[in-house]
A protein has these predicted regions:
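Short, solvent-exposed turn/loop segments enriched in Gly/Ser/Thr/Pro and often Arg
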Residues: 1, 140-143, 196-205, 225
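N-terminal catalytic cores of secreted or lumenal carbohydrate-active enzymes
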Residues: 1-159
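Acidic, His- and aromatic-enriched active-site or binding-groove loops in soluble protein domains
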Residues: 2-37, 156-176, 213-256
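Glycine- and acidic
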Residues: 103-108, 157-171, 191-195, 272-281, ...
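Acidic (Asp/Glu)-rich catalytic clusters
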Residues: 123-138, 153-155, 212-214, 254-260, ...
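Conserved, mostly hydrophobic/aromatic
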Residues: 137-139, 197, 212, 265, ...
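CE4/NodB-like, metal-dependent polysaccharide N-deacetylase domain
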Residues: 164-201, 296-315
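C-terminal domain-boundary segment and adjacent tail
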Residues: 219-237, 249-252, 288-351
Length: 351
C-alpha cells in the first residue's frame, strides 16, 4: 500500500506488533548488514542491539521486543543515508538524535526522505552533464563479458584451463544487443548517449573493440596489466607502489578497426587499491595528501616527456568502498578535490 518494492522497506514500514516469526528472523538476520566501525558504532543503541544479537551463539526471537525491532529498522535505514544529506534534510538529524523509541510513523518518514533523495539523483546527473562537469559511461546491459560472448575460443588464450567452457558459444548477436541496449537505456534516462563504455571485468579484445566502435562508442577502458601484455612492457613499481616509468600508462591509445577507431585509456592499478582498501583506515587529510603526492610524483617523472599533456586514469571496479570511511569519505574527497583544484598544473577532464 505504501508503494514499497523490496522486503527491507516493507518491513521497515510495518507494525512491529504484528510481525510474524519469519519476518522477525529476517530482520535480525539482515538489518545488521552495516559496517560496524563506521556505521553501527556511530549509534549507541544500534551498537547495543548488535552486541545483544551477536554476544551469544544463538539469539532467539523472544530476546528482542517489538520496540527494539522498531529501533533496529530505523537505525539501519538511517546509517545507510549519506551523512551529507543530513544537513539538507534537518528532519533526518532530528530522527538520528532520537536514537530510541522509534515509532512506525518515524520509520515511514525515514523511508519517505530516502525516496526524496533518490528522486534527486537523475536530475542532478542531468544538471552536471549539461554543465559539462561530468561524463557518463555505461556497461553492457546485463554486465556481459563481451570477449566470451563474441568468441569463446579466443578467450581461452587468457585462462589456465578450458574445462567447463563451451566449445563454441557463438553469441555475437547477443553481444551487440548488450551494447546497444545499454547505450539506448542511458540515452532514454539522461537524454545523452554515452561516448564511453566500461567493459565488465575490464575485458577487451580486438573483436570487442570492433563491436564497440561500430556501435558508436568513442572510448573504453582497461587495466594496466592488459596494456603491459599488449605492448610487451613491464610496469615496475618501487616498494611504495610508485611507477618507475609511468609514460606508457598515461597516454590515450587509438585502436583502428576496419571501419572506425576507438580510444582506449588504461587505469593505474595501485591508486584505486589505495582508495578502496588503505585510505579508509587513516586520517582523511593525510590520505588525501598521500594521494596528491603520488599524483605529483607521477607528474614530475613526465617532465622530460615529449608529450605536452598526459592522462592519469583513476578508476575503480571495486564494490562501494565509501562505507569503510568515516562519514562516507566526505572529508577525504573534499581534501583531494581541493588539492587538485588549487593546483594549476592539474586539470580534471572529460574523456
Amino acid at each position: 500500500e505504501q508503494g514499497y518494492h523490496d522486503i527491507h522497506s516493507e518491513l521497515t514500514a510495518s507494525d512491529t506488533e504484528r510481525l510474524t516469526d519469519e519476518e522477525k528472523a529476517f530482520i535480525l538476520n539482515n538489518f545488521f548488514s552495516s559496517k560496524f566501525e563506521t556505521m553501527i558504532y556511530r549509534s549507541e543503541n544500534y551498537k547495543n542491539l548488535y552486541q545483544k544479537r551477536f554476544s551469544k551463539d544463538v539469539a532467539t526471537l523472544e530476546d528482542f521486543s517489538a520496540q527494539e525491532l522498531s529501533d533496529l529498522m530505523a537505525l539501519f535505514n538511517l546509517v545507510w543515508i549519506d551523512p551529507a544529506h543530513f544537513a539538507r534534510y534537518p528532519r533526518l538529524e532530528e530522527l538520528w538524535e532520537k536514537q530510541y523509541n522509534y515509532t512506525q510513523e518515524d520509520r515511514i518518514e525515514i523511508l519517505s526522505i530516502q525516496k526524496s533523495i533518490i528522486r534527486e539523483i537523475i536530475p542532478t546527473y542531468k544538471k552536471y552533464i549539461e554543465e559539462g562537469r561530468i561524463e557518463l559511461s555505461t556497461s553492457p546491459y546485463y554486465h556481459a563479458i563481451l570477449p566470451i560472448l563474441i568468441d569463446v575460443k579466443a578467450s581461452v588464450k587468457s585462462v589456465l584451463t578450458t574445462e567447463g567452457l563451451p566449445a563454441n558459444l557463438g553469441m555475437l548477436d547477443d553481444a551487440k544487443y548488450q551494447i546497444k541496449s545499454a547505450l539506448d537505456r542511458i540515452e532514454e534516462i539522461f537524454g545523452v548517449r554515452p561516448k564511453g563504455m566500461w567493459p565488465p571485468e575490464l575485458c577487451l579484445g580486438p573483436k570487442t573493440l570492433g563491436l564497440l566502435s561500430k556501435a558508436g562508442v568513442k572510448w573504453t577502458i582497461s587495466d594496466e596489466g592488459v596494456l603491459a601484455n599488449s605492448i610487451n612492457f613491464d610496469f615496475i613499481r618501487d616498494f611504495k607502489g610508485n611507477l618507475n616509468d609511468p609514460y606508457h600508462l598515461l597516454k590515450v591509445y587509438e585502436y583502428q578497426t576496419k571501419e572506425n577507431s576507438i580510444d582506449i585509456i588504461f587505469r593505474d592499478r595501485s591508486i584505486p587499491n589505495l582508495i578502496n582498501f588503505e585510505y579508509a583506515g587513516i586520517n582523511p587529510k593525510m590520505a588525501a595528501g598521500d594521494l596528491y603526492e603520488k599524483i605529483k610524483m607521477i607528474q614530475n617523472k613526465l617532465l622530460v616527456s615529449p608529450d605536452k599533456t598526459h592522462l592519469l586514469t583513476i578508476a575503480s571496479d571495486c564494490e562501494n568502498c565509501w562505507e569503510n570511511y568515516q562519514n562516507d569519505g566526505i572529508e577525504f574527497l573534499e581534501n583531494i578535490y581541493s588539492l587538485i583544484e588549487n593546483d594549476e598544473s592539474l586539470e580534471t577532464v572529460l574523456i
